[in-house]
Regions:
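N-terminal Rossmann-like or analogous alpha/beta NTP/dinucleotide-binding catalytic cores
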Residues: 1-114
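Alpha-helical recognition segments enriched in aromatics with Gly/Pro capping
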Residues: 109, 119-214
Length: 214
């Protein structure tokens, strides 16, 4: 809520100067579930670890997914404090193809991007894998499906679903090897590059961020 309040202050300041401005409340509901939240152990969410939260059923049964249920808590807070916003969901953004051209450009330049990420923050992962995670066609997990090759002419990535370390936890992969079409199949950019893609696609002029995103 704090980030939204600060961004809303910038929006109001711009409007006070005569500019048109809008606040986008963006739900990263294509991100995978990394752990079961405290107080929710009894809902059987453990089996969904690694799956996009928008593909996990709402354990309370009142929204179309676990992700939308959690998003609704933030939106309720924004409504209560009177913040005006436009709500957007990651799953809709990707399904509608709003980032497909950005994904194509990023994957074509993945070597340069991997080297730059390593240089700036010391993370070498994207020198080995593409900065794009397809949703595994077999187990529906995200972070376990690591893409190693981009077929430019077909706009497809080749990936293997294998065990992946997320923090101190190991998420089990199913071993599936496949291809995913970035224009049709579900998947998402790694957040370090997705940040830039969203700024371009939505014409974002201000958003709080840390130095690891630069």
């Amino acid at each position: 809520l704090g980030d939204a309040v600060r961004a809303y202050g910038v929006k109001l300041a711009l409007e006070n100067q005569g500019y048109k401005s809008e606040l986008i409340a963006y739900s990263d509901d294509l991100d995978g579930l990394r752990k079961v939240p405290e107080g929710m152990k009894e809902f059987g969410l453990e089996e969904h670890i690694g799956k996009p939260v928008s593909l996990i059923p709402d354990p309370y049964g009142c929204h179309d997914s676990y992700g939308m249920h959690m998003s609704s808590i933030l939106l309720d807070g924004l409504d209560k404090v009177g913040i005006k916003y436009e709500f957007r969901r990651a799953i809709d953004t990707y399904k509608q193809g709003l980032l497909k051209d950005h994904i194509h450009t990023i994957l074509q330049n993945s070597v340069k991007i991997g080297d730059k990420i390593s240089e700036l923050v010391g993370q070498e992962k994207y020198q080995k894998y593409l900065p794009y995670f397809p949703v595994c066609a077999e187990c529906n997990r995200l972070y376990t499906a690591e893409a190693t090759e981009y077929i430019v002419t077909e706009k497809k990535v080749k990936y293997t679903c294998h065990d992946t370390e997320i923090g101190s936890k190991t998420i089990k992969g199913c071993g599936h090897e496949g291809e995913a079409d970035i224009t049709k199949d579900l998947g998402k950019l790694a957040w370090k590059v997705e940040f830039a893609a969203r700024w371009s696609a939505f014409d974002i002029r201000f958003e709080a961020y840390g130095k690891d995103i630069m």
